[in-house]
Amino acid sequence: EEAKQRGNDLFKRAKYSEAVQAYTESLSHEPESDVLLLNRSAAYMALGQYGQALADCERAVQGREPSGKALLRMAKCQLGVGRPDAALYTLSPLLSQALGTSAEQAQARDVDAQAREMQRHLTTADAYSRERNWTLASIALDQAQGIMKLTDATSPRAWQEKRVMLLLQRGHLGQAQSLAMDIYRADPSDTSAIMLGARIMLANNDVQKALQQSQLALRLDPDMQAAKQFLRKCKALLTLKDDANAAFKANRSDD
């Protein structure tokens, strides 16, 4: 109880990391306390750590009737991890007025509007990408991020990958490489992250290193089709390069 109160006090003073530690200490004594889990999720949300916050919300409602407060918080976390469809589903008991106070139902309508707006921006980003309008696709992704005040660093992994590809297509190789390295450092065994690096190497005309990266991805996931196709492309480029070099040398010897 002392740790819980300390966590509440720290949260009120905007010391969110310390509040997380206090709630974690309290949860070691009451691991199934929905109140503590929701309190810690609020602290995680304040830190922009929506994945951890969502995990706490899911534990808080597991095996019990969820409160309106819990569903609202969960829906916001789902938006924070880029899952507007899930947020809309979570909000449905509040929107149908089957659960929650009138104030919670009003908040649910606001979050519902945010979820639908996020859906629209993501759909727009995909549509512009198919049209190869990389600038407008980037703007749409910016707008999707803005709903939950996300940055490229705090965005969901799938959005980070979208951003890297958009930066590549727009010729911003330095920014693309920086974000791709952040993704890779988070999980060096992730084949998607490895292939992002390979694409950047190819864009930098380092075909040999790009080929090696695709081979690494295939060692980790032999069935990865994207890596297989990319490897074939790199081999074809190296063959063209070798043929061009051979032709150049032959021409020089003829002279």
Model-identified regions with their sequence ranges:
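Alpha-helical tetratricopeptide repeat
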Residues: E1-D255
